[in-house]
C-alpha cells in the first residue's frame, strides 16, 4: 500500500489600501469596534457599493507577479451564506470569472526548484470579526471594522506534497506581496490567512483511491500549518486502514486545528458551490480593462521579485544560497546591501557583515533596517578598512560597536581612537627583533617544536604595539626572523 499526500492552499491576503473594497471607509487594523463603518459596510437598505480601483490594480500586479493570465472583463458576484459577522447575508466576491487564472510560482525544495500552479486569484470583501467572551458562553460581539476590507484570494492547485512545500509556497507568496507593497501579510492581525486542503491518494492492490478532503482552518502561523498537515496525513492514513473512506463516498469536510493539542477536530461538512447561490452582483457593472491599462500598471509598479533577485545576487556577487535567501527576505534589507556593495572591493565580506553584525543588532532591538542608524556606506567603509589590513576583524567589531553608539562612520572612530593597524613591515620588523632579543628561551622552545612559544612571542609583539600591529604580517615576519636565528 502506497500513500501520496496531496495539498491545496486557499490564501486570503488583506490588501493595505487606504479605503475598503466597495466604500470609502478607512481600511485599518484595530481601533474602537464599529468605528469605521457605513451603510455599505453594514448592508443597510438603499446603500450601493462602488469599486475601489486600487483593488483591481492590486489584483493586476499580483496576477503578473504570479505569471497569471489577467482577464479583460471584471465581474463581481454575490456569495450567499449566513453568519453573524456578514451583515448583508452575502459577500461580494468573484465566482466563475476570476480576474486572474492559470498562474504559477517556483519554490525551492531539497531536490531543486518545483513549480506550483495557481488555479485562480479573485477579489472579494472581508467579513466582520466575531468576538466570544471567555467567561461567558452566552455573549458574543461583532466588530464590523473589518467588514468590506479588500481581499485577494489565491487558490493553489493540489501540487503540494508536504508541509515543508506548503510553507515554502506561502513564504514565496508572502515575499511577493510584501515586495510589491500590497500587504503586510501579518498572520497575527489576520492580513495573511490560509486554509489548507489535505487528502491522500492511496494505491492499494493496483487501484488508486482518494481519501475525503479535509479543509483545515484556525491556522495562525507557518509552524501551525506544517504541524496540521503532518497530523492530518497520519490521521487519514489510519482512517483509511480502519474505514476505507473515499472522497466519492464522504466528500469534503472542515476541520479546525488546536495548537495546544496538535490535532485537527471536525467542525462541519463543507458547503458546495451551489450552497452559496452565486449570481452576478446587480449593483456593480462589468468593468472592461484593456491590455494597455494592464501594461501600464505593470510598468509603473512592478519591481524585481525575490526569486529573480536571488538568481542575480548569486551570479553577480557569488553569494551562497543562504546569503541570498536571507537578503531577499526583506526588500529593505536587500536595498541596504545593494547600496553598501556599490563601492566595495569585497561584496561577500559586506554581505557577511550585514547578515551577522547588522542583523544581530536589528533582531536584538526588534527594529527594521529602515530604523537602523548607520548608513550603508558606513558598512562599506568599515569593510574596506578590514580588507586593506588597516584594522583587524576583532578591532572592527569594537569599531562597529562605537559606530552604533554614536551613529558615526568607521573613519571617525578609527581616527579619534588611533586604532589603525601598523602595517609598515620595517616598523613591525623592529618590534619583532626586540621581542626576540628579550626572549631567548622562547626561541629555544620554538626550535624544539613547542608551538606555544610562537603564541607567547606574538602576544609580546601585540603588547609592545598596544594591539595595533597587523597580526598576519607580524606572524609572517616573526616566522621569517626565527628561521634566520
Curated annotation (Swiss-Prot):
UniProt-listed PROSITE patterns: GATB
Catalytic reactions of this protein: L-glutamyl-tRNA(Gln) + L-glutamine + ATP + H2O = L-glutaminyl-tRNA(Gln) + L-glutamate + ADP + phosphate + H(+); L-aspartyl-tRNA(Asn) + L-glutamine + ATP + H2O = L-asparaginyl-tRNA(Asn) + L-glutamate + ADP + phosphate + 2 H(+)
Record keywords, A-Z: ATP-binding, Ligase, Nucleotide-binding, Protein biosynthesis
Root EC class: ligase
Domain of life: Bacteria
Assembly, per entry: Heterotrimer of A, B and C subunits.
PANTHER family: GLUTAMYL-TRNA GLN AMIDOTRANSFERASE SUBUNIT B MITOCHONDRIAL AND PROKARYOTIC PET112-RELATED (PTHR11659), GLUTAMYL-TRNA(GLN) AMIDOTRANSFERASE SUBUNIT B, MITOCHONDRIAL (PTHR11659:SF0)
The protein's role, per its UniProt record: Allows the formation of correctly charged Asn-tRNA(Asn) or Gln-tRNA(Gln) through the transamidation of misacylated Asp-tRNA(Asn) or Glu-tRNA(Gln) in organisms which lack either or both of asparaginyl-tRNA or glutaminyl-tRNA synthetases. The reaction takes place in the presence of glutamine and ATP through an activated phospho-Asp-tRNA(Asn) or phospho-Glu-tRNA(Gln).
Family according to the record: Belongs to the GatB/GatE family. GatB subfamily.
Protein name: Aspartyl/glutamyl-tRNA(Asn/Gln) amidotransferase subunit B
Source lineage: Bacteria, Pseudomonadati, Spirochaetota, Spirochaetia, Spirochaetales
Amino acid at each position: 500500500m502506497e500513500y501520496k499526500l496531496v495539498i491545496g492552499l486557499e490564501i486570503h491576503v488583506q490588501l493595505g489600501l487606504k479605503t475598503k473594497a466597495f466604500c470609502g471607509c478607512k481600511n485599518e487594523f484595530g481601533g474602537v469596534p464599529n468605528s469605521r463603518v457605513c451603510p455599505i459596510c453594514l448592508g443597510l437598505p438603499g446603500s450601493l457599493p462602488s469599486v475601489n480601483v486600487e483593488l483591481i490594480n492590486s489584483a493586476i500586479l499580483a496576477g503578473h507577479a504570479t505569471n497569471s493570465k489577467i482577464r479583460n472583463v471584471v465581474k463581481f458576484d454575490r456569495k450567499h451564506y449566513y453568519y453573524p459577522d456578514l451583515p448583508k447575508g452575502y459577500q461580494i466576491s468573484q465566482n466563475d470569472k476570476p480576474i486572474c487564472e492559470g498562474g504559477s510560482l517556483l519554490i525551492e525544495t531539497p531536490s531543486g526548484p518545483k513549480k506550483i500552479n495557481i488555479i485562480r486569484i479573485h477579489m472579494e470583501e472581508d467579513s466582520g470579526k466575531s468576538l466570544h467572551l471567555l467567561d461567558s458562553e452566552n455573549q458574543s460581539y461583532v466588530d464590523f471594522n473589518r467588514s468590506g476590507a479588500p481581499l485577494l484570494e489565491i487558490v493553489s492547485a493540489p501540487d503540494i506534497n508536504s508541509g515543508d512545500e506548503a510553507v515554502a509556497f506561502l513564504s514565496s507568496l508572502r515575499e511577493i506581496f510584501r515586495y510589491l507593497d500590497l500587504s503586510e501579510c501579518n498572520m497575527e492581525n489576520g492580513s495573511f490567512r490560509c486554509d489548507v486542503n489535505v487528502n491522500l491518494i492511496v494505491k492499494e492492490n493496483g487501484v488508486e483511491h482518494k481519501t475525503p478532503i479535509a479543509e483545515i482552518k484556525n491556522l495562525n502561523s507557518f509552524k501551525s500549518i506544517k504541524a496540521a498537515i503532518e497530523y492530518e496525513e497520519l490521521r487519514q492514513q489510519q482512517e483509511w486502514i480502519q474505514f476505507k473512506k473515499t472522497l466519492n463516498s464522504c466528500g469534503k469536510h472542515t476541520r479546525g486545528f488546536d495548537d495546544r493539542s496538535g490535532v485537527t477536530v471536525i467542525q462541519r461538512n463543507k458547503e458546495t458551490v451551489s450552497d452559496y447561490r452565486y449570481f452576478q452582483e446587480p449593483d456593480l457593472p462589468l468593468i472592461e480593462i484593456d491590455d494597455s491599462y494592464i501594461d501600464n500598471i505593470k510598468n509603473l509598479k512592478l519591481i524585481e521579485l525575490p526569486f529573480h533577485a536571488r538568481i542575480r545576487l548569486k551570479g553577480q556577487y557569488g553569494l551562497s544560497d543562504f546569503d541570498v535567501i536571507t537578503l531577499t527576505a526583506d526588500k529593505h534589507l536587500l536595498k541596504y546591501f545593494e547600496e553598501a556593495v556599490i563601492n566595495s572591493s569585497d561584496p561577500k565580506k559586506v554581505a557577511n557583515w550585514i547578515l551577522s553584525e547588522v542583523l544581530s543588532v536589528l533582531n536584538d532591538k526588534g527594529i527594521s533596517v529602515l530604523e537602523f542608524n548607520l548608513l550603508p556606506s558606513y558598512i562599506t567603509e568599515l569593510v574596506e578598512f578590514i580588507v586593506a589590513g588597516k584594522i583587524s576583524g576583532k578591532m572592527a567589531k569594537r569599531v562597529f560597536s562605537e559606530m552604533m553608539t554614536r551613529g558615526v562612520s568607521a573613519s571617525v572612530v578609527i581616527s579619534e581612537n588611533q586604532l589603525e593597524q601598523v602595517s609598515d613591515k620595517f616598523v613591525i620588523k623592529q618590534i619583532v627583533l626586540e621581542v626576540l632579543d628579550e626572549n631567548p628561551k622562547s626561541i629555544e622552545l620554538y626550535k624544539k617544536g613547542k608551538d606555544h612559544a610562537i603564541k607567547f612571542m606574538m602576544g609580546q609583539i601585540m603588547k609592545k604595539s598596544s594591539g595595533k600591529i597587523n597580526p598576519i604580517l607580524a606572524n609572517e615576519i616573526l616566522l621569517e626572523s626565527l628561521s634566520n636565528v
